[in-house]
């Protein structure tokens, strides 16, 4: 059925080193557990699980209650890495082409939140 997991803060997570545990089943039905250090995430080369952990930590508003990430991210596997900033640009362009101004503005907001995160590093 695809990638399925939950996120929780690690017991040793701190304000200076926020750490999240992702635990679940990958797209092949194999169980996994990953430790994600938020400060080490690079949205220009990240997995979907890393970005969902970053999204949760930052409290980015979710479109329709699901995710702030572009729709294409839903097709990614556990270890697939991509440039989410490029993915956002493509999604914004697609939404503008379809005259979906509110959706385009939402993805612009989301992308800006992740740019701000990268610029704080």
Give the positions of each predicted feature:
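Type III/flagellar secretion export determinants
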Residues: 1-121
């Amino acid at each position: 059925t695809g990638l399925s997991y939950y996120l929780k803060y690690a017991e040793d997570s701190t304000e200076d080193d926020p750490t999240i545990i992702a635990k679940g089943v990958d797209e092949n039905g194999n169980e996994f557990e990953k430790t994600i250090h938020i400060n080490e995430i690079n949205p220009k080369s990240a997995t979907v699980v890393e970005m969902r952990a970053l999204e949760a930590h930052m409290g980015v508003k979710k479109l329709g209650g699901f995710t702030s990430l572009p729709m294409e991210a839903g097709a990614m596997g556990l270890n697939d890495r991509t440039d989410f900033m490029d993915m956002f640009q493509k999604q914004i362009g697609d939404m503008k082409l379809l005259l979906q101004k509110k959706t385009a503005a939402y993805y612009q907001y989301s992308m800006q939140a992740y740019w701000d995160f990268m610029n704080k590093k």
